[in-house]
Amino acid sequence: MCFPLPSNSFKTMTDLDYMRRAIALAKQGLGWTNPNPLVGCVIVKNGEIVAEGYHEKIGGWHAERNAVLHCKEDLSGATAYVTLEPCCHHGRTPPCSDLLIERGIKKVFIGSSDPNPLVAGRGANQLRQAGVEVVEGLLKEECDALNPIFFHYIQTKRPYVLMKYAMTADGKIATGSGESKWITGESARARVQQTRHQYSAIMVGVDTVLADNPMLNSRMPNAKQPVRIVCDSQLRTPLDCQLVQTAKEYRTVIATVSDDLQKIEQFRPLGVDVLVCKARNKRVDLQDLLQKLGEMQIDSLLLEGGSSLNFSALESGIVNRVHCYIAPKLVGGKQAKTPIGGEGIQQIDQAVKLKLKSTELIGEDILLDYVVISPL
């Protein structure tokens, strides 16, 4: 859509600046577009921005359409900067490539290629065949960073998994007595609420439910609420816990291997979906669970489990990203739990290998953002 812009305010902007503006616009859709990608679009004519837009929500207009259709300017001869290759197929909305051609756009800068099999280079090729000059790969790394969830889901049909945990400077997620509220400060906890808004689902193990009785909702104002998932192999989740009692308000799923129909039927009238999965060592097979969640169009999963579930997730090879919050506190104690439990590994060369993407100071706490490059 068109936003009021000061006269001549962007006269000295470069191609890189325009694409950075498109990236900033795309980020405004965080949490609302899943399972669609984040996309921003800026249209420039005679050195000035005349239209801009972003994909605001699932089912809504795409970025290019938002920019073009809310603008009354003649766009003939203009240049478009789009963070993701324009679509060329009919989905919930008509093709964006057709619209850019119809409005006389003469040049299009594209940040990321779209791996969606329905697009996958066809959008750029259609523009070229219509005589539009296409430049691909402008700020590709930054544009790619907008959509790790979309890229993963569209190619695997499984959720992108982010493991999140908070620990003290000596690597403890709780004291020896089990107390964990609160390890991090308010600012870090507020960031977690934003992350919950951005992910389609959040998962904990039944031990976390029994110990903390969590709600697992996003407390950010006007947030989109994630699907709440409990990994509970033997259906030990109490019927009177907060997750079950609020299941009609917030979608709640229990993943289990139990075939106890009497137990299963106790949850259904309360609004809980019980998902029976394959068993692996008498526990939920997390690979099978991810397959089922993908079929439910859940494109992303925030894992806020305890040490046992965290290790199981790593052992199953489902984790794509890790957010490690470190608080400036020391608690010690041999019995105090660490973020990753389970049996662990026996040899260092078998360790899960991570790549550090960023380090951020949030209040007094540190957030380390890693991607998994070598799973177990």
From Swiss-Prot:
List of residues binding NADP(+): 166, 182, 208, 212, 233, 306-312
Chain sites annotated for binding substrate: 180, 196, 216, 219, 304
Entry keyword annotation includes Ligase: no
Keywords: Hydrolase, Metal-binding, Multifunctional enzyme, NADP, Oxidoreductase, Riboflavin biosynthesis, Zinc
Catalytic activity: 2,5-diamino-6-hydroxy-4-(5-phosphoribosylamino)-pyrimidine + H2O + H(+) = 5-amino-6-(5-phospho-D-ribosylamino)uracil + NH4(+); 5-amino-6-(5-phospho-D-ribitylamino)uracil + NADP(+) = 5-amino-6-(5-phospho-D-ribosylamino)uracil + NADPH + H(+)
Domain CMP/dCMP-type deaminase: 13-135
Residues covered by region (Deaminase): 1-157
Pathway(s) of this molecule: Cofactor biosynthesis; riboflavin biosynthesis; 5-amino-6-(D-ribitylamino)uracil from GTP: step 2/4; Cofactor biosynthesis; riboflavin biosynthesis; 5-amino-6-(D-ribitylamino)uracil from GTP: step 3/4
UniProt-listed InterPro entries: APOBEC/CMP_deaminase_Zn-bd (IPR016192), CMP_dCMP_dom (IPR002125), Cytidine_deaminase-like (IPR016193), DHFR-like_dom_sf (IPR024072), Eubact_RibD (IPR004794), RibD_C (IPR011549), RibDG_C (IPR002734), Riboflavin_Biosynth_HTPR (IPR050765)
Keyword Oxidoreductase tagged: yes
Regions crossing the membrane: none
PROSITE patterns: CYT_DCMP_DEAMINASES_1, CYT_DCMP_DEAMINASES_2
A Gene Ontology BP annotation from the UniProt entry: riboflavin biosynthetic process
Pfam entry (one): dCMP_cyt_deam_1
Gene Ontology terms for molecular function: 5-amino-6-(5-phosphoribosylamino)uracil reductase activity; diaminohydroxyphosphoribosylaminopyrimidine deaminase activity; NADP binding; zinc ion binding
Role, per record: Converts 2,5-diamino-6-(ribosylamino)-4(3h)-pyrimidinone 5'-phosphate into 5-amino-6-(ribosylamino)-2,4(1h,3h)-pyrimidinedione 5'-phosphate.
PANTHER family: 2,5-DIAMINO-6-RIBOSYLAMINO-4(3H)-PYRIMIDINONE 5'-PHOSPHATE REDUCTASE, DIHYDROFOLATE REDUCTASE FAMILY PROTEIN (AFU_ORTHOLOGUE AFUA_8G06820)
Family: In the N-terminal section; belongs to the cytidine and deoxycytidylate deaminase family. In the C-terminal section; belongs to the HTP reductase family.
Protein name per UniProt: Riboflavin biosynthesis protein RibD
Species, as recorded: Actinobacillus pleuropneumoniae (Haemophilus pleuropneumoniae)
